[in-house]
C-alpha cells in the first residue's frame, strides 16, 4: 500500500477467467503479476478475458490476424462473443493504427451497430492491461458504491457551501413572497 495525499490506496484485485488459448501470452502473465486471481478455462471463447465480479468481458484480437483470415470468420467469432456477454469489449491490437486498421474497426462497428460491443484500439500489452483493469475496476460494485457516495457527498457540500446556490435560494425565497399562489 502506498500513501498519497494522506489517503491510503488499496490495491484492487479480482478474479479473472482467461481463455486457455491465452495461457502462454504476455497478457495472462501481466494479469497474474498484478496479483489478480487468474483462472484458465477451455469453455470460454478463444482469446477472451472475463472479469466476472465486474460483469465485463474482453475479446482480444490482433488486427494482422483479422486481415489474414476471412472477414466472416472473425465477425462470426465477435458475434458469438457479444451474444454470450452483455457487457463486451473488443480489444484490437495493432502496433500502428493506420488507414487499414481504422477501416477494419469501421467495418466491425457497421456490422455490430446497435449492439453492446465497444471497440478498444490498443498498441501493446501494457496499454491493453491498463484499459481492461480500469474498466473492470470502475464497473465493480464496490467502486460504483464508492463513486455514488462521493457524488452524494459532493452534492451535499455544494448545496451547503456554494455562494451561488445560496444566492439562488435567496432569489427563490424572495420570489415566493411576491407570488400570490
Swiss-Prot record:
- Can you cite a GO biological process for this protein? synaptonemal complex assembly
List where this protein forms a coiled coil: none
A single GO CC term for this protein reads: chromosome
Pfam families, alphabetized: SCRE (PF15162)
Where is this chain's protein located in or outside the cell? Chromosome
- Just give the chief location class: nucleus
Keyword Cell membrane recorded: no
InterPro entries, per database record: SCRE
The residues the entry assigns to the signal sequence are none
**Which UniProt keywords are present, listed alphabetically?**
Chromosome, Meiosis
Reported function: Plays a key role in reinforcing the integrity of the central element of the synaptonemal complex (SC) thereby stabilizing SC, ensuring progression of meiotic prophase I in male and female germ cells. Promotes homologous recombination and crossing-over in meiotic prophase I via its association with SHOC1. Required for the localization of TEX11 and MSH4 to recombination intermediates.
Question: Whom does it interact with, and what assembly results?
Answer: Homooligomer. Interacts with SHOC1, SYCP1 and SYCE3.
- Official protein name in the record: Protein SPO16 homolog
The organism is: Bos taurus (Bovine)
Amino acid at each position: 500500500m502506498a500513501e498519497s495525499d494522506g489517503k491510503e490506496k488499496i490495491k484492487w484485485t479480482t478474479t479473472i477467467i482467461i481463455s486457455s488459448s491465452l495461457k502462454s501470452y504476455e497478457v495472462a502473465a501481466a494479469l497474474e503479476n498484478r496479483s489478480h486471481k487468474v483462472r484458465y478455462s477451455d469453455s470460454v471463447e478463444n482469446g477472451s478475458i472475463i472479469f466476472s465480479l465486474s460483469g465485463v468481458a474482453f475479446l482480444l484480437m490482433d488486427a494482422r490476424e483479422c486481415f489474414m483470415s476471412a472477414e466472416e470468420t472473425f465477425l462470426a467469432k465477435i458475434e458469438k462473443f457479444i451474444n454470450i456477454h452483455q457487457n463486451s469489449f473488443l480489444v484490437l491490437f495493432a502496433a500502428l493504427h493506420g488507414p487499414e486498421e481504422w477501416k477494419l474497426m469501421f467495418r466491425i462497428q457497421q456490422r455490430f451497430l446497435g449492439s453492446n460491443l465497444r471497440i478498444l484500439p490498443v498498441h501493446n500489452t501494457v496499454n491493453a492491461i491498463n484499459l481492461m483493469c480500469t474498466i473492470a475496476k470502475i464497473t465493480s460494485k464496490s467502486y460504483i458504491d464508492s463513486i455514488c457516495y462521493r457524488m452524494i457527498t459532493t452534492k451535499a457540500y455544494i448545496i451547503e457551501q456554494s455562494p451561488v446556490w445560496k444566492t439562488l435560494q435567496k432569489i427563490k425565497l424572495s420570489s415566493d413572497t411576491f407570488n400570490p399562489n
